[in-house]
């Protein structure tokens, strides 16, 4: 446990795309990042679980090259007035990190939740 080197994986998953950014433990320095468009070319496939697995596998290889063997995961959905549940790529990415041999510390949901923010879109319902 003393020789573990940790990083933080920020997974932003919507129903249109999945973006994974890996930073150092403070969140200041970006170590590696990937998005759906970097893996597949069709826009309809950017948010798919398969694409998220490919991205996580590539990032796991980059992390191993840099000597990082453990990550904490922060999952984020669009939030605010939008969808509060993460897209299909989030769970697939977490599984792919684990399958690639990266140790997972904490999994945290950091979706922004409004404390009665702006008015939601759509007409008035009576």
Swiss-Prot record:
Annotated keywords: Ribonucleoprotein, Ribosomal protein, RNA-binding, rRNA-binding
PANTHER family: 40S RIBOSOMAL PROTEIN S14/30S RIBOSOMAL PROTEIN S11 (PTHR11759)
Subunit annotation: Part of the 30S ribosomal subunit.
Protein name: Small ribosomal subunit protein uS11
Homology family: Belongs to the universal ribosomal protein uS11 family.
InterPro entries linked to this entry: Ribosomal_uS11, Ribosomal_uS11_archaeal, Ribosomal_uS11_CS, Ribosomal_uS11_sf
Entry annotated with the keyword Membrane: no
Keyword Ribonucleoprotein: yes
PROSITE patterns named among the record's database cross-references: RIBOSOMAL_S11
Function comment: Located on the platform of the 30S subunit.
Organism listed in the record: Methanosarcina acetivorans (strain ATCC 35395 / DSM 2834 / JCM 12185 / C2A)
Swiss-Prot/TrEMBL GO biological process terms: translation
Pfam family membership, one: Ribosomal_S11
Single GO cellular component term: cytosolic small ribosomal subunit
GO MF assignments: rRNA binding; structural constituent of ribosome
């Amino acid at each position: 446990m003393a020789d573990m080197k940790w990083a933080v994986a920020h997974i932003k998953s919507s129903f249109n795309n999945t973006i994974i950014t890996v930073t150092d433990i403070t969140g200041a320095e970006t170590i590696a990042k990937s998005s759906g468009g970097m893996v597949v070319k069709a826009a309809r496939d950017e948010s798919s679980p398969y694409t998220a697995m490919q991205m996580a596998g590539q990032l796991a290889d980059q992390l191993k090259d840099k000597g990082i063997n453990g990550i904490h995961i922060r999952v984020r959905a669009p939030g605010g007035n939008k969808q509060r549940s993460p897209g299909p790529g989030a769970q697939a990415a977490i599984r792919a990190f684990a399958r690639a041999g990266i140790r997972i510390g904490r999994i945290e949901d950091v979706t922004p939740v409004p404390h009665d923010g702006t008015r939601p879109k759509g007409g008035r319902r009576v």
